[in-house]
Amino acid sequence: MFKLCVFVALLSLAAAAPAPAPAPAPAPGLIGPGIVAPGIWGPTVVGSPLLAPQVVSVVPGAISHAAITQVHPSPLLIKSVHGLGPVVIG
């Protein structure tokens, strides 16, 4: 009987314990806006202003005939992607 009482007491303590806090989400804008492009092994982030602030033109290997231009510190602008037609992000 004593063991049952101890078991019930421990069980009630475990049930009353607060749940562990979830992991904090990364702050928005830490990496900056980027372009997620289709890649050979899944979606690929082509670039962002924070990671590549001086990039003027990027041609990733995963996208054929892509012309990507950055305008000042604003998000990247895709002029055209072969096979997808004209795409503008900005």
Curated annotation (Swiss-Prot):
Q: Tell me which positions the record assigns to the signal sequence.
A: 1-16
GO cellular component terms listed in the entry, alphabetical order: extracellular region
Task: Locate the Isoleucine amide modifications and list their residues.
Answer: 89
Q: Which gene encodes it?
A: Nplp3
Protein name as annotated: Neuropeptide-like 3
Q: Which species is this UniProt entry from?
A: Drosophila melanogaster (Fruit fly)
Note the superkingdom of the native organism: Eukaryota
**Propeptide span(s):** 17-54, 67-79
Record keywords: Amidation, Neuropeptide, Secreted, Signal
> Which cysteines are cross-linked by disulfides?
none
GO terms of biological process kind: neuropeptide signaling pathway
Q: Where in the cell is it found?
A: Secreted
Molecular function GO labels: neuropeptide hormone activity
Predominant location: secreted
